[in-house]
């Protein structure tokens, strides 16, 4: 197997793009590489669903992503809130499209199938690029949540989507010198570039924690995220067929890879949540039970409050008019 050849990968793992690459076969009179083992189909209401277990995991991933987005949106003053939300939106869109492709909503061999797989490849690259750009937010090189920050992330993610989409479609349709048997370009943009971007993100976050935070616990979130992602890729590309045969085609590597990817994304959320905090004064209006009066002060103790430990630096309630600071706080 040469560099950029998908034959060995597709024999082991039931990837959606494998139906659109490889040499022309005499049996099917078309391109495609069939995996050695893949999960059995299930029938629900006279409808055949491919990859039943992986499809169910995609649905669970969609639900969990919605929960994470709601939690992120609830931290109104956290650093990088809008940027990390963009990442979760892209991941949710990628998961939904993967559900459609894996479950057979768009069946392999149909006319629109290559386009859907090309969009899936583009979304995968856009999601990884968005995550890498998120890695720079914590260094405060530019103000987070501003049009500069958001549009830079959107444009970079859009560029990654367009490049991967066009390369994948050109590979499937034999355009611009690419083709089902010339898959080097697709391999580079879909695997090498994405791997480099993930590596950059991890290095940036390790540097951020080591150089700017006193708490080292977020390194555990990074380590667990790396473990889950790498474990999913190893199972998918190195152990899918043996696992599938051992459990009688009930599951294959695609199910485990989908599960591990979800766990890795959850670790990204956990890491972001652990290094950011919300300014209480801006959130008290949305959380009704933050303050509860236990006992009223005696009449003789009702006097001006002294702010000895107040982070805003006022000495008494009468020194100057109080106005809440607009600055957001984080542990960076």
From Swiss-Prot:
Principal place of residence: endoplasmic reticulum
The family this protein is said to belong to: Belongs to the CHS7 family.
InterPro entries tied to this protein: Chs7
Function as written in the Swiss-Prot or TrEMBL entry: Chaperone required for the export of the chitin synthase CHS3 from the endoplasmic reticulum.
Transmembrane segments: 52-72, 87-107, 116-136, 158-178, 184-204, 219-239, 249-269
Name assigned to this protein: Chitin synthase export chaperone
Subunit structure: Interacts with CHS3.
